[in-house]
Amino acid sequence: MTATVKDELSRLRVAKPCCRRAEMAALLRFGGGLHIVGGRIVVEAELDTGATARRLRREVAEVFGFPSTVAVLAAGGLRRSVRYIVRVERDGEQLARSTGLLDQRGRPVRGLPPQVVTGSACDAAAAWRGAFLAHGSLTEPGRSCSLEVTSPGPEAALALVGAARRLGVQAKSRDVRGVDRVVIRDGDAIGALLTKIGAHDSLMAWEERRMRREVRATANRLANFDDANLRRSARAAVAAGARVQAAMRILGDDAPEHLLAAGRLRLEHAQASLEELGALADPPLTKDAVAGRIRRLLALADKRANALGIPNTEASVSPDLLENA
């Protein structure tokens, strides 16, 4: 999934100058750094895809007006894959100052530039886009799904955690064998971040794989069911879970809290009956009350989807989904 996300982000067109600057600042910060060559400051970034290297060169030229060079390092030895080295030599110091890699006194900035750290939500999203393009990875959805960015240091990692917080996404900074990483493990949080940074097609593919894994897990449990009624109930639970998950994605936080709470209960206890869900609610509810709230949540989401011209919750229940159940 990492290559898929990076390919999509590399093709994303961004119009706002502040966002383009924030993305480039993060891409250079997480992808490389500053070097002194012959008494001059050289800005360098080492990247793992040619598309990202081309994007960096184009943006440096269009936004900042500086030329750059690219060198290709073939795979071999300790390098498992081709690497692309983008360098700005003649105008390195000017680029470093323009992107905030150097402060006003000419000292290296260890985290992210102040204009990115204190910027708007779009700047935070752009910084995450640049950081992911530089050193991000996304694992296949499953029990241990994660989105990670390798950081050049703890200051940059904490700045990225703060940027995620401004986007409403919880990320954590961790030191793994001496390497600073920013990690997001919650599936819904990963989906929210992919949306924020503009990886919409990748999100759909990731969510589809995530749903298939959940369906397979349910199918494995169904293999031990002898009672046909239990099978029908399980299929209904899969369908209900898929529709509620779609409703939560469509509505976000824009729905009455008691309806969202019922939806969360359904997702957190996928195999529970309505009566069991009612007992788990706080305060407890009857099964009819739980069913009514979930129905209203789905209706609200379908109405919103129709208004926006996007697939409604019914579209999430495909024949393949039920057949695999």
Swiss-Prot record:
The record's listing under InterPro entries reads: Homing_endonucl, Sporu_reg_WhiA_N_dom, Sporulation_regulator_WhiA, Sporulation_regulator_WhiA_C, WhiA_LAGLIDADG_dom
Q: Which residues bind DNA?
A: 273-306
Q: Which domain of life is it from?
A: Bacteria
**GO molecular function per UniProt:** DNA binding
Gene Ontology terms describing biological process: cell division; regulation of sporulation
Question: What are the protein's UniProt keywords?
Answer: Cell cycle, Cell division, DNA-binding
What family is reported? Belongs to the WhiA family.
UniProt cross-references to PANTHER family, sorted A to Z: CELL DIVISION PROTEIN WHIA-RELATED (PTHR37307:SF1)
Described function: Involved in cell division and chromosome segregation.
Database matches in HAMAP family: HTH_type_WhiA (MF_01420)
Protein's UniProt name = Probable cell division protein WhiA
What is the organism field in this record? Frankia alni (strain DSM 45986 / CECT 9034 / ACN14a)
Q: What is the lineage of its organism?
A: Bacteria, Bacillati, Actinomycetota, Actinomycetes, Frankiales
- Gene name per UniProt: whiA
